[in-house]
């Protein structure tokens, strides 16, 4: 029997983007779910109310993309979770960095009249 060489292509990894109303957290995992690297808008350098902006989400995504390219994680599946302002900006930051995006999923949970909502904020 022949010994076939394994392909030299980069392994597939998941980029999980969690956007909340206050922050954006991006977590890169392998196929088994083990965390390889992560970043948040706060860890990039945005503090306070600036973490919730779309520019902070884009900067966080660009930092994660640079680290992915450094580790040869080029082929990615993207998973979005949460309701925040930075979804499109984070996707734009990942696309412009040179990653090969294979699939995009949105896993945001939508309640069908589940738990009672928090009361509205009045200013």
Predicted regions span which residues?
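Ribosome-associated RNA-binding proteins
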Residues: 1-123
């Amino acid at each position: 029997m022949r010994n076939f060489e394994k392909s030299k292509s980069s392994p597939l990894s998941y980029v999980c983007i969690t956007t909340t109303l206050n922050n954006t957290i991006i977590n890169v995992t392998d196929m088994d779910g083990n965390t390889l690297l992560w970043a948040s808008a706060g860890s990039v350098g945005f503090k306070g109310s600036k973490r919730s902006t779309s520019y902070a989400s884009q900067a966080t995504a660009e930092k994660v993309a640079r680290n992915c390219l450094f580790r040869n994680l080029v082929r990615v599946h993207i998973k979005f979770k949460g309701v925040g302002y930075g979804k499109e900006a984070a996707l734009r930051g990942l696309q412009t960095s040179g990653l090969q995006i294979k699939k995009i999923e949105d896993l945001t949970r939508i309640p069908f009249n589940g738990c009672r909502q928090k009361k509205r904020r009045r200013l």
